């Protein structure tokens, strides 16, 4: 091999050889001959490789120090990266390429930060675009078309500005007329006969005219800001198009792409820090607004309490007990199975709504809704101008003024008629699609709310404790300030603060059409003014209105249903099932809630609702008789009587308007809830008797290691006992479950109304074991030798505080609520018998080897005692929950994504969002529950000892390792069975139905090597199951748009921060000076209220979580829509969203008006000056100027309609100079900007070049002149280009 240094001494080493630049004559002839030879043997050469051909004479192969192969031409003493044999194996042009081939001289390479890029060795250049695709041309055409449409939209905004200015001129003229009349009336006030007008009416009209002028000035400012925003966005798009067209091939090389990427990351860091500053400023504004509200209220009436001072009593009581604790094991089992089934259905419903929204995005053009809104607003402005002209009195006008006004009216009527005809044909379909999208969004929001409620309910089940009131769990951070190496589409173009609350365009169009129809009717058939006023003053009272009821109802009950409700809604009981909107199982999605009737499950008693749900499910499964709700207990959390049985006259007085969950006083005066003083007073005259309760005291002695249980007294046990209490007695029995070998009992008493037991027991137990137990107290009656359990109380010791002693009243759950309760035929009532029953039920047993009670009694029918039968399913259930929750995925897990880093970040958010919440196999839970509840009805040929649990739950549960596997007697009893691999689930027969009934994750494969994998298929890792989408090509235009979008966001963020700082300073000064005008503006201004509502710390945590869920759902919808793009095809909708981002309205920060009111009219003013001013505003020249402006605006629109298409060939035309407006230059000063942002000009620095330091000034938009100074060009030997 020739020496590389010798060949490099006479040529440029590591550069492209000169024979790839202008060739010599003999080299051109040789190259031409090679082309002709290659055309004859093209088909054969495609099947050959480099190894099939030897290197030409004088050529050699070498490798660089980094392993890159290059070729040496010893004849010409040059080096090259090109293989000289490519002329035999590769096509010469793109037309000759087959499939994914690249022609000779092209190479595809990969950069870990940028991705794939392409090298043109012939032209010594690199580019980001794939040369085989024409996506760049399509993008340029789309950009040109959008700029043409945006120009029309801008013209509509400017025409709207002209109409608004005309309205302001007429309003100012009317105001000056009224001011002059009020001045003359004040001068002639000494004699009422000399006054032609009532002074009081003149002052009222003057006040209305002044407010109207002020309102029009504010609207004019908003339109001016909109125009300046749109103009800036269009100028940015024009500059992007010109910059791309100015390139030699319209592409950035790889070094420029790398520099742009680094610049985007720097700007993104500045955006993250700026957003934190903006949020802090908005929180400060919330505090200042609240302080101004307090000052205003204190000035008006110091005796009234401030509405901002609220006291939350949610954490002042020990809230314990819930429906889950009051229900025994079987009911709790079925209730959780049903809740998880609802949760699964809601997850499916959310996925379906997301898919429908992804489909709707393709039907609605991005930016088209904004254009339709501008058209409708323009029509509405012209209607208002026409109404203003119609309201002008013509009595004091000259003939010339009357003629101008009539011409202007006629012109406006013709324009409105043409606009309505055009809009009715082209806007109707788009608005229909938009209305459907809004309906889907509303359904999605309701679905997320319901799912969040179900998640909280599942958390209470999974923790084996009662419901608790908390401040809300952390959802994790959705900030994009992570250490990701690249920015995704959603990071740049989806921003929760980027867009204001949208205007309801559908309602706006309907209102505009209604005004037009009324105007047409008035022209055809004039209406008497008095009748017209009566028609407009009609008020429709809602059935939920406070005018038609004594007090607002607490919840939409069946008694106060209005006429607008459907018959189905009238028949529905206010149970938990219809209070919490849930989709029907495996059917269509839920219907839209009835307007005016909003479900509030917190207004109803949770225990009653849970039992009603259980009753409905049990009746559906034919598992028992209907439950008796006459003795429905009260939960310790909400000791409020159920509203189901209240009559109408009491229902209207027993409701609460508070937004918190009201808790009334307990039944007994010794109740903790009653003594706490934070509950509402108990309702005295209830149409039902009181419910059964027991008073239990608990205290733990740490030194002795003993739990002291005091069973003090009970109240109204007759509610549980329907038989005669003459010859019966009652006592209490308690045990610590599970695995308790001893139980305690009180003495038997004959008083069922208020028995006083006063028995204290000491149970030795360690503290760590105590916290894992639950205390179960049962109420047992004795009639002769027969005992019967009539109620039970279950207390979780997990929330017991060993440092303190408690004495509380607990509600007793009647045995009638659970069909599994049965009578106990026990001859003796000793405590040893009950302890033996507990021990027999919890001890391990297998086959016929079963421990039985050896005491005075045995349990009949080979069943466990009622105590342990009610408790064991609950413990097995908890173990199954713990195992299931570890293997289930989060809510709304994204199925596909192009950005792995974004997926990882959202996975962390999901895990924090729905921690300890999962989805169990509900059908398996119900099957297990059926086997527990109907154990005695099992087939006698099948020995069903105990309910079967899946293998994955048994593997993680230590308490159930020693229990036998449920088997059929038809299998060989002596066969050795290993629980770790024996996972056959038996049904009632020994046929193939005994196999696993789950749905296989793959199709059946006969003769598969691993047949056992078809039984229980483990969940594949996420990296395998995730659908990896094909690479969507990116172009230089995409990259430049992303960079300019980041700069635009930073520019407007700096502008918002400057305005917020200015607003904060003004409001602070007004708060210190107690300025009533500024305080009134801060409280009454709707725009300011919407701004501070975004960062109000008093907002409900659930609302914040819902907003984050909606934001996350928007990202998932974008991912779903990307998966619908065909393989290898560009995403047209995403590119349209990119270019519409620049003309989309951002977050508007209100500005304090310079003058809150116009100056009052001075009645002592000289009359001559007023007459001169009156002559100026009433002169016909002013009216003619207004008419001229209208005609000019109409001619401009006519020219635009005659030339709808503009020439877009060549360079993109420059936007004409914008109209000079006061808000054309946003007030973003460097001094008022606290965000430290990096320099706008990135430099590809060498090793010795220091990095650019951050500057305090905002990053300006990159200009065309700064492009030449962006890079220092050097020669890169790896890429072979100048960078």
UniProtKB/Swiss-Prot annotation:
InterPro entries linked to this entry: C2_dom (IPR000008), C2_domain_sf (IPR035892), WW_dom (IPR001202), WW_dom_sf (IPR036020), WWC/KIBRA_Hippo_Reg (IPR051105)
Bias type Low complexity, positions: 30-48, 856-868, 1217-1262
Predominant location: cytoplasm
Biological processes per GO annotation: border follicle cell migration; negative regulation of glial cell proliferation; negative regulation of organ growth; positive regulation of apoptotic process; positive regulation of hippo signaling; R8 cell development; R8 cell fate specification; regulation of DNA-templated transcription
GO molecular function: kinase binding; molecular adaptor activity
Recorded coiled-coil stretches: 200-228, 334-462, 1048-1075
Acidic residues biased stretches: 895-909
Region annotated Disordered, chain positions: 1-59, 537-559, 840-871, 887-910, 941-969, 1197-1263
The WW domain, residue ranges: 53-86, 100-133
GO CC terms of this entry: apicomedial cortex; cell-cell junction; cytoplasmic side of apical plasma membrane; Kibra-Ex-Mer complex
Bias (Basic and acidic residues): 941-965
Basic residues biased stretches: 20-29
Keywords: Cell membrane, Coiled coil, Cytoplasm, Membrane, Phosphoprotein, Repeat, Transcription, Transcription regulation
Domain of life of the source: Eukaryota
Domain (C2): residue spans on this chain: 690-810
Similarity comment text for this entry: Belongs to the WWC family. KIBRA subfamily.
Function: Regulator of the Hippo/SWH (Sav/Wts/Hpo) signaling pathway, a signaling pathway that plays a pivotal role in organ size control and tumor suppression by restricting proliferation and promoting apoptosis. The core of this pathway is composed of a kinase cascade wherein Hippo (Hpo), in complex with its regulatory protein Salvador (Sav), phosphorylates and activates Warts (Wts) in complex with its regulatory protein Mats, which in turn phosphorylates and inactivates the Yorkie (Yki) oncoprotein. Kibra acts synergistically along with Ex and Mer to regulate the Hippo signaling pathway.
Quaternary state and interactors: Forms a complex with Mer and Ex. Interacts (via domain WW 1) with Ex (via RXPPXY motif). Interacts with Mer, Sav, Hpo and Wts.
Protein name per the record: Protein kibra
Lineage of producing organism: Eukaryota, Metazoa, Ecdysozoa, Arthropoda, Hexapoda
């Amino acid at each position: 091999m020739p020496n590389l240094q010798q060949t490099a001494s006479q040529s440029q080493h590591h550069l492209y050889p000169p024979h790839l630049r202008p060739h010599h004559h003999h080299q051109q002839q040789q190259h031409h001959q090679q082309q002709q030879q290659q055309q004859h043997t093209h088909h054969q050469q495609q099947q050959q490789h480099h190894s099939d051909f030897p290197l030409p004479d004088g050529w050699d192969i070498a490798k660089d120090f980094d392993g890159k192969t290059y070729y040496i031409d010893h004849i010409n003493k040059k080096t090259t990266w090109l293989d000289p044999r490519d002329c035999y194996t590769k096509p010469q042009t793109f037309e000759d390429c087959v499939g994914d081939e690249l022609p000779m001289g092209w190479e595809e390479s990969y950069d870990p930060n940028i991705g794939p890029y392409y090298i043109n060795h012939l032209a010594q250049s690199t580019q980001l675009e794939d040369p085989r695709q024409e996506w760049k041309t399509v993008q340029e055409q789309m950009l040109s078309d959008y700029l043409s449409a945006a120009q029309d939209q801008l013209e509509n905004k400017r025409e709207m500005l002209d109409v608004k200015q005309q309205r302001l001129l007429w309003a100012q003229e009317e105001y000056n007329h009224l001011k002059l009349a009020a001045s003359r009336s004040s001068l002639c006030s000494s004699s009422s006969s000399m006054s032609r007008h009532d002074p009081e009416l003149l002052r009222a009209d003057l006040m209305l005219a002044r407010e109207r002028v002020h309102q029009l000035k504010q609207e004019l400012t908003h339109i001016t800001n909109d125009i300046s925003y749109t103009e800036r966005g269009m100028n940015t798009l024009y500059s992007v198009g010109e910059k791309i067209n100015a390139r030699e091939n319209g592409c950035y090389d790889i070094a420029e792409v790398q520099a742009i990427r680094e610049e985007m990351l720097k700007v993104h860091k500045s955006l993250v820090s700026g957003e934190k500053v903006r949020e802090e400023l908005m929180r400060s504004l919330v505090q200042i607004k609240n302080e101004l509200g307090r000052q205003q209220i204190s000035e008006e009436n110091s005796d009234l309490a401030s509405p901002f001072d609220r006291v939350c009593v949610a954490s002042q009581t020990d809230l314990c007990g819930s429906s889950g604790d009051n229900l025994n094991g079987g009911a709790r089992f079925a209730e959780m199975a049903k809740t998880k089934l609802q949760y699964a259905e809601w997850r499916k419903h959310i996925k379906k709504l997301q898919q429908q929204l992804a489909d709707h995005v393709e039907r609605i053009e991005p930016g088209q809704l904004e254009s339709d809104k501008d058209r409708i607003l323009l029509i509405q402005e012209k209607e208002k101008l026409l109404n203003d002209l119609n309201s002008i009195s013509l009595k004091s006008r000259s003939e010339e003024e009357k003629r101008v006004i009539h011409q202007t009216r006629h012109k406006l009527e013709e324009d409105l008629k043409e606009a309505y005809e055009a809009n009715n044909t082209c806007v109707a379909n788009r608005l229909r699609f938009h209305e459907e999208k809004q309906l889907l969004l509303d359904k999605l929001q309701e679905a997320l709310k319901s799912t969040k409620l179900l998640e909280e309910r599942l958390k209470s089940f999974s923790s084996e404790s009662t419901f608790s009131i908390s401040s809300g769990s952390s959802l994790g951070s959705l900030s994009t300030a992570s250490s990701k190496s690249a920015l995704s589409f959603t990071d740049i173009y989806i921003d929760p603060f980027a867009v204001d609350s949208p205007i309801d365009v559908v309602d706006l169009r309907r209102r505009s059409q209604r005004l037009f129809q009324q105007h047409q009717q008035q022209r055809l058939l004039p209406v008497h003014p008095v009748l017209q006023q009566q028609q407009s003053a009609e008020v429709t009272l809602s059935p939920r209105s406070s005018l038609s009821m004594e007090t607002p109802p607490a919840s939409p009950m069946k008694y106060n249903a209005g006429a607008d409700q459907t018959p189905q809604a009238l028949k529905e009981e206010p149970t938990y099932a219809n209070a919490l909107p849930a989709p029907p199982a495996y059917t269509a999605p839920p219907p839209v809630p009835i307007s005016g009737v909003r479900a509030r499950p917190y207004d109803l008693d949770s225990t009653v609702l849970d039992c009603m749900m259980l009753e409905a499910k049990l009746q559906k499964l034919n598992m028992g008789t209907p439950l008796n709700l006459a003795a429905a207990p009260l939960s310790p959390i909400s000791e409020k009587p159920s509203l189901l049985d209240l009559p109408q006259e009491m229902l209207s007085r027993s409701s609460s308007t508070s937004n918190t969950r009201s808790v009334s006083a307990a039944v007994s005066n010794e109740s903790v809830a009653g003594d706490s003083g934070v509950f509402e007073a108990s309702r005295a005259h209830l149409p039902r008797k009181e419910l059964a309760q027991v008073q239990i005291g608990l205290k733990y002695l740490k030194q002795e290691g003993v739990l002291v249980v005091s069973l003090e007294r009970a109240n109204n046990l007759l509610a549980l006992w329907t038989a005669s209490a003459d010859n019966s007695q009652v006592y209490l029995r308690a045990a610590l479950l599970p695995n308790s070998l001893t139980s305690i009992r009180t003495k038997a008493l004959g008083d069922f109304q208020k028995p006083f037991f006063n028995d204290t027991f000491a149970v030795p137990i360690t503290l760590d074991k105590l916290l894992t137990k639950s205390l179960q107290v049962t109420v047992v009656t004795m009639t002769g030798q027969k005992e019967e359990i009539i109620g039970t109380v279950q207390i979780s010791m997990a929330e017991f505080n060993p440092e303190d002693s408690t004495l509380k009243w607990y509600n007793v759950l009647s045995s009638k609520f659970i069909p599994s309760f049965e009578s106990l035929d026990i001859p003796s009532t000793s405590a040893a018998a009950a302890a033996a029953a507990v021990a027999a039920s919890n001890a391990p047993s297998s086959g016929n080897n079963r421990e039985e009670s050896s005491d005075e009694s045995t349990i009949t029918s080979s069943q466990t005692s009622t105590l342990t039968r009610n408790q064991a399913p609950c413990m097995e259930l908890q173990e199954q929950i713990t195992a299931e929750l570890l293997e289930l995925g989060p809510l709304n897990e994204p199925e596909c994504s192009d950005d792995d880093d974004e997926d990882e970040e959202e996975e962390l958010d999901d895990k924090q969002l729905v921690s300890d919440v999962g989805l169990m196999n509900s059908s398996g839970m119900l099957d297990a529950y059926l086997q527990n509840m109907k154990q005695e009805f099992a087939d006698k040929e099948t020995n069903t000892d105990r309910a079967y649990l899946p293998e994955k739950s048994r593997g993680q549960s230590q308490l159930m390792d020693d229990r036998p596997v449920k088997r059929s007697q038809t299998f060989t009893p002596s066969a050795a069975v290993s629980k770790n691999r024996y996972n056959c689930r038996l049904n009632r027969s020994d046929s193939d139905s005994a196999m696993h009934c789950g749905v296989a994750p793959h199709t059946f494969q006969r003769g598969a090597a691993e047949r056992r994998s078809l039984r229980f298929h483990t969940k594949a890792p996420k990296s395998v199951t995730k659908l990896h989408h094909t690479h969507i090509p990116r172009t230089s235009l995409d990259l430049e748009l992303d960079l300019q979008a980041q700069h635009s966001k930073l520019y407007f963020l700096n502008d918002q921060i400057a305005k917020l700082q200015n607003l904060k300073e003004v409001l602070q000064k007004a708060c210190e000076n107690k300025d009533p005008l500024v305080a009134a503006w801060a409280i009454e201004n709707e725009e300011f209220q919407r701004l501070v509502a975004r960062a109000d710390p008093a907002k409900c945590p659930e609302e914040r979580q819902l907003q984050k869920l909606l934001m996350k759902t928007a990202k998932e919808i974008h991912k779903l829509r990307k998966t619908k793009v065909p393989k290898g095809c560009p995403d047209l909708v995403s590119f349209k969203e990119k270019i519409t981002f620049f003309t989309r309205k951002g977050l508007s920060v209100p500005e304090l008006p310079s003058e809150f009111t116009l100056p009052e009219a001075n009645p002592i003013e000289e009359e001559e000056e007023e007459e001169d001013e009156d002559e100026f505003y009433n002169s016909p020249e002013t009216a003619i100027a207004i008419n001229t402006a209208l005609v000019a605006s109409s001619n401009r629109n006519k020219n635009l309609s005659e030339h709808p298409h503009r020439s877009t060939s060549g360079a993109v035309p420059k936007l004409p100079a914008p109209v000079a407006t006061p808000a054309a230059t946003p007030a973003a000063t460097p001094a008022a900007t606290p965000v430290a942002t990096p320099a706008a000009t990135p430099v590809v620095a060498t090793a010795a070049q220091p990095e650019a330091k951050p500057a305090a000034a905002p990053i300006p938009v990159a200009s065309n002149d700064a492009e030449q100074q962006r890079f220092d060009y050097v020669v890169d030997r790896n890429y072979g280009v100048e960078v």
